[in-house]
Structures are given as C-alpha cells and as structure tokens.
Amino acid sequence: MKNNKNAFTLQGETAPFRVTREQMEKVNELHVLGIVAAEVRLKQTGEINHLIGDVGENEREFQKRYGELKRISKQTPIGISGLQQSFDEFLLTDGEAKVLYQVDRQGEPIFGKQAKYTSPGNPFYPVRIQTTLHKELQQKAEEVIEANEIKKGGLVLLDVKTNEILAMASKPSLQVRDENLYKTTLENQMLTPHFPGSVFKTVVAAAVIDQKVNLFNRTFNCNKDLYGENDPQVRMGTLNFKESFARSCNRTFSELGNELLQKDKTVLETYVAALGANEKVGWKGSVFHTPHFEQMPEEKGTTIWGNEENKNSKKAVEQTAIGQKDVRISPLAIANMMATIARNGEKMEVKAVEKIVYKNGADFFTFESHTLNGKQLSYETVKTLQELLRGVVTREKGTGTAFRSLPLSVAGKSGTAQTGKGTRVNRWFAGYFPYENPRYALVVVDLETDSKVNKVTPIFKDMVGAIYQLENEK
C-alpha cells in the first residue's frame, strides 16, 4: 500500500474482496489509514448471467454516451450487455470516490494522521436495479441447464399473473476471461429468434379455431409427409384435429395452413400478434427523460416470412405452417405466448426489472405492468387452445406424456425444428402449469443439437419439481 500513490481496489487471489454491508461498516469503524470499504461497480470474471449482463472499460463508448459528464473518469466501468447496459445511465457512479490523507513533500503518507474518504456524498446514488428474478429458481435453472450439458439453448420461466421473468438461463455461458470466446458467447439465446418447429402449430391452431374452420367429422391422412407426397418419418394413420395437435402431425397443419392463407394472406401475422409473440415482447415505455426505454434492447423480434412471394407458394406455406422455412421466434416470445394462453388471452409485455431503488432503499421508479395492444383472442378460442395444449400431455401417444407424473399438471407443446445445419435440430417444450390455475409459463430449448438424447424433457420436469417443492416448503 505504501508504494501506491493512487487509490486502488484491494484484491484477493482472483477478484476484489467481497464484504457484506455489516462487514463494510465494521471495517470503516476501525479507521485504518488508507483502507475504506465501499460499494463499487466492477467487471465480473468467469461465467456471468446473460440477462444481468457485463460491465467494462471502454473510453470511446463512454465518450459517445456521456461525453458531457466531465466530472466522471472515462475509465469508469460501463454496462456493455444485458441489464447492465440498458440501465447503465442509472447505475453510473455520480462522480469519483477517493481516499484522502495528508502526505509529506515526497507524496508519502504522514502516518498517524486521519484518512478521509470522500465520495460524491449523495445519499440517493448510485441507485440499485431490483430485478424480477427469483433467486432460488434462477439458481435451479442454471444448475439443470449445466447438469444436462446444454451447449446452446436454455430456459425462460415467467410468472403468469405478473408476466415477470422469474428465471432465465442461456448457453453458451458468457466467457469474460477469454477474449476470443467473449464475442461469440455475448448473445442471449433466450432473446434471439430461432426456428420454433411444431411449437408454431399453436399459432395455426389458434387461427383455425378463431376463424371457425369446419373441423366437424374431418380427418387428416397422417401417413403422408407435410406435402402429402411421401411417407413421413412416423406413420400415424388417420387423425382428427385434436389428435393431430397432440401427436404433432405435420400434414394436418400444412393442409390447414394453406387453407387459411388462401382466405387471408396476413392470417399468421394476425394470430402471432394475438398470442403476444410478435415483434419485441419485453417492457418498453417512457422512463423520465427517455421516451422509448427498453428493459431488454437486445431482444429481437419475430419473423414469419422471408418475403411476400412465399405466401403464394404452396410448399413455402406448408413449411411455414409447421414452424420452418423463415419462421424465427425467441424463447422469450414463446414463453409470452404460453403465458397469454394461460391468462385466457390477456396480452402483456414481459418485465425483467420491477423497480429502480435509491441507495437509501426508497423507490425511485416502478415499472408498471403494460398490456400489448391489438387483437385479442376470444374466450372460446383460448379455452379450446388450453384443452389442445393439455391434450399433448394427457392424450394417448401425445408428445408430452412424460409430464403426466409431475406433481403439477402441465399443458404445452413440443417442437423439433430442422436448422439447415446437417442433422442439427432445435428441440423445444413450451408450456404452463398448473393447468387448472396457471401460475408459471416455462420454455426449454436445446438449440442446434445433434444429440439423439432429449435433454429438454428432464429439464422441464426438474424445474416443475423444484417449483412444487419450493411452494410446499412455504
């Protein structure tokens, strides 16, 4: 310490010493010259949560964002991803903190004199961001994703009533120690659109029901592929609409997709929006001087069509109707779709942050719940959709029969999407629970996997089990 002319952070072996607020107060009560325990914002090391994000020093970016703030050092760490980035202007330190003490003419401290700690002195700043994450469920999410060796993918868990994110885990983990891996692992896969596969049949089903397509006594030849030309991978025989949804028959939905598009070229866009899964679904609105603030600006919106011409191509429509071709939806948007269905069609924006809190604990800004505008599904349509999603689990040969034994009743939809990358597929299960009184919406996805092992099912089951256990402990 004696050889350091400027204030510095005392390091352990790999990182600064972390202390509790109580320990911080005790250290400062000792009045040891030159040693002060204080709150600082530091760049993290190792693996970090994508939603929370990372901070780092970037003079050029600092100048771009805060060039007019002359009192703050350009070396001040700023948010470069996740909530750290979107809430950076609130989290930025209000000036520099320093340790002041008397020195001799050589600049050496005069020991025995009192050291003085100065900071901007504002009891209100820096503010804290209170996220919606549930500590135990977030830890469980990270554990099960890790234990099941998901290389790319993750999960999103929403509170159905509030539409808040309770847990979000994304792989590959953000690697901050390796510069080469850092850029390739920066993307939060839960906010990035991917091929949804058969999960998208939920949208087609909503349109079919709401448009009152005549399904009475109608059956579909599920011994044919989606084009009605060749044998599919699995011959299912002749199925009605409800059986087709439960067993995920491609031919049924490609046929119905074409019928819908012949009547209305924007039908799929209409029902993706009605289910709360179009564009960006994260919280956005006015926050003080920022009229268009987004909690999750890294979120990317849904794509259904690559170009308008494809709407006139029978095969392109058939591929689109089963969540292939150009369809891309983020896991967050799919989770929002399931939460919308669970709430009987009420559409809401998704929150990751509940409020901003002053340093002294008082509320600074509360993020009120926002509804999503536009068409809303009728009560009758939603009730039928709910029954279809429950049938995936309860019907004989449904693709979700593995969830029957869970302590909470599940409704949902599976999906396996081709990715165009050889044998690699996206494997999904999206649903909500308990079915009778929905409280949670959960999406699990294993992206671009060539593994023959279904890792999605055990992860979904583990999360439901953990929630049941947590609720019963209370």
Where do the protein language model's features map onto the residues?
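Short, gly/Ser/Thr-rich active-site loops of penicillin-recognizing serine hydrolases
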Residues: D363, E368-N373, I459-K474
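A short acidic/glycine-rich loop-to-helix N-cap element
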Residues: E448-P458
